[in-house]
From Swiss-Prot:
Homodimer. One of its GO terms (molecular function) is sequence-specific DNA binding. Residues 74-93 bind DNA. The lineage of its organism: Bacteria, Pseudomonadati, Pseudomonadota, Gammaproteobacteria, Enterobacterales. It comes from the Bacteria. Gene3D superfamilies: Homeodomain-like. This is DNA-binding protein Fis. Belongs to the transcriptional regulatory Fis family. InterPro entries: Fis_DNA-bd, Homeodomain-like_sf, HTH_Fis, Trans_regulatory_Fis.
């Protein structure tokens, strides 16, 4: 089970282990671990466009959750994300 919270402008991920203990760590740690796993699976193969791959993996869930949180209000969502509303509209297409 994962849960995201904002604490002092740092996104954290809460996880529940097998003993039902909740632990929190910064989202960046989860991203770092996911990248370590990704590199381990590559077995030395070259990668192209890793930056774009990571952004695409993060951007869509971000857009989905912000739009859900703002109940579809694109102006409010754009303000929350710190981007222009037109830019948000393009990303939502």
């Amino acid at each position: 089970m994962f849960e995201q919270r904002v604490n002092s402008d740092v996104l954290t991920v809460s996880t529940v282990n097998s003993q039902d203990q909740v632990t929190q760590k910064p989202l960046r740690d989860s991203v770092k671990q996911a990248l370590k796993n990704y590199f381990a699976q590559l077995n030395g193969q070259d990668v192209n466009d890793l930056y774009e791959l990571v952004l695409a993996e993060v951007e869509q869930p971000l857009l989905d959750m912000v739009m859900q949180y703002t109940r579809g209000n694109q102006t409010r969502a754009a303000l929350m994300m710190g981007i222009n509303r037109g830019t948000l509209r393009k990303k939502l297409k």
